[in-house]
Amino acid sequence: MTIEQSAPESQSSAARFAVKVDLVVIGAGQAGLSSAYHLRRLGFEPDRDFVVLDQAPAPGGAWQFRWPSLTLATVNRVHDLPGMRFDEIVGTESDTVQASAAVPRYYAAYEERYDLRVHRPVKVSVVCDRGERLRVETDAGAFSARGIVNATGTWETPYIPEYPGADRFRGRQLHTKDYRTADAFRGQHVVVVGGGISAIQLLDEISQATTTTWVTRREPQFREGPFTEEFGRRIVAMVEDKVRQGLPPGSVASNTGSLPLTPAVRAMRDRGVLNRLPMFSEITETGIRWADGTEQRADVILWCTGFRSSLDHLAPLQLREEGGGITMTGRLATQVARDPRIHLVGYGPSASTIGANRAGGAAARELTQYLEMSPAEVRSSG
């Protein structure tokens, strides 16, 4: 199956016709690749039984867009994809390697080894219910599918909260997604907003190049040492409970309630960088202002306020509850309760790399069983 970008003159005909396929996997990051791998293991063939569509221009998921100074030593652990170790591709002495180079190299090798035939760049614009099938509209044409594994992650949906005066600020407002290097801020005062791991990492870098102010909504709590596997399992269980109730999963920081007190964080504290201030009440033309009238001049406001799940293309399916969450079911909470033909892998408890691996397997098995799909060799011998 060859998928090409639709030319403008063919869009009207594309609206009438759709390529029929059993399953569409949307996204080719950790969650999407894991799901595709497990579909293959179950005997289903890419480009015949399922297709994998990825919006990114190259393998690597969101990792290919991360800032250059983010190395394998400073990221949360990158877990192996099923069937292929990470160190097979990047080696065991790779802490100083850029994450934006190493992980894409690993994903590319993985796609090739298992012949997953990812189609890119293909952007899914909308998914609609067409009775027994789901219509998946993309900028490369339409697909008619019996089921969907959605693995679109969060990178394309940065979250910036609304604050009074934001539209009149004369400086720059950026998000974590926009960050490249601290050198870009030399000679400027940067307000870093956010209390998560990314906020701490960027505050560390930027504060070594220029002056900073750090503000958070909640008082940050630090805990000794890195997070343990047991602690991680408790957090995953907490998030799983939320999504099974139809509640929004929340950010990692909001669920962990604390940040690891690493050597780098201790060094920041010794430098006086962790002088956290509460959230300001408004943004002015030249900076920020708190409720008591105190002002801080700023050239840049860097919003390290996280991301939201990239699910806008699923809006016509009306999967959300009144509170904004999606009620999930299934063994690992990947199946959408309102429409069991849809699995969200990388949402809620499967948002971590290790969670995505396990969830990809569960989604592949549960979805093919629900749709009563049989591998080609079984169909041909029946």
Labelled PLM ranges:
Residues 86-94:
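Glycine-/proline-rich flexible loop or hinge segments
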Residues 58-87:
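Redox-cofactor-proximal catalytic regions of oxidoreductases
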Residues 2-56, 61-64, 69, 93-382:
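Flavin (primarily FAD) cofactor-binding/catalytic cores of flavoenzymes
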